[in-house]
Design a protein with these regions (language model features):
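Charged, terminal alpha-helix-loop-beta segments
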Residues: 1-235
Length: 235
């Protein structure tokens, strides 16, 4: 555990609970450990309305933009406007320009050249997961799509997939890189705080501005306007 290293542009937060215990930010040294936390809490971070696929398979053409996404998120927030996201899990210590920016560029190229492989990978995961099957069945009962093939054709072939970067600190440099990309890209900032053997996870939920304070009897599809709160200090 490193407590006071790599403060970045904004410095590290500390969290105090009701009992007065102080939690200090845990600095992940390995991307694999950070990714384990993201996957373990995928439903809370990405949203219970969608499905996270922990799939790591090469897509695209070797030497022509091939890449391996860290995962996929099928966003089912809107019953008639689903969307597929390729997920890139990163540490802020990595090169924002040479590594993260290049990965998103490769995502964009590969989603154009390897659509069928992406679809088949997702289908295979659904076929062996009853939980995903049930969530999709509930979705189909309220949407215009009748089955998983129709849904995946929509989000992969008809619409262009987007990207999500899950990172431990979202800096201005990251947002600058994103502004230069043609692929629609969202950022989720996630961090872990520790106090002895206790842990807390702090994150910016995906599409939180859409579903926060939404009454149970109101469908997200019925919203006419979505107001996104301004980002303060990159969060």
């Amino acid at each position: 555990l490193i407590k006071e290293k790599g403060l970045g542009e904004r410095g590290m937060y500390k969290i105090v609970d009701e009992s007065g215990f102080v939690y200090t930010q845990y600095i992940y040294l390995k991307e694999a450990d950070f990714e384990k936390m993201i996957v373990a809490h995928a439903e809370q971070i990405f949203g219970a309305a969608g499905i996270y696929f922990d799939i790591k398979k090469l897509i695209g053409t070797p030497k022509k933009g091939a890449t391996i996404p860290d995962g996929y998120f099928l966003d089912l927030t809107f019953h008639n406007d689903p969307r597929l996201y390729l997920v890139e899990v990163e540490l802020n210590s990595h090169d924002v320009y040479g590594h993260i920016g290049e990965q998103i560029l490769r995502f964009g190229i590969s989603t154009e050249t390897d659509k069928y492989k992406i679809k088949n990978s997702l289908l295979a995961e659904v076929d062996k997961d009853s939980g995903k099957q049930q969530k999709l069945a509930d979705y189909f009962s309220k949407s215009k799509y009748n089955n998983i093939n129709e849904l995946l054709d929509k989000v992969i072939f008809d619409n262009r997939p987007a990207a999500i970067i899950a990172i431990d600190e979202a800096t201005d440099a990251l947002y600058h890189v994103m502004s230069q990309l043609t692929m629609t890209t969202e950022v989720i900032e996630a961090q872990t705080y520790v106090c002895g053997d206790k842990k807390l996870h702090r994150f910016s939920p995906f599409k939180d501005e859409v579903i926060t304070d939404l009454a149970p009897d109101i469908d997200a599809d019925e919203l006419d306007t979505i107001i996104v709160p301004a980002r303060e200090d990159g969060f």
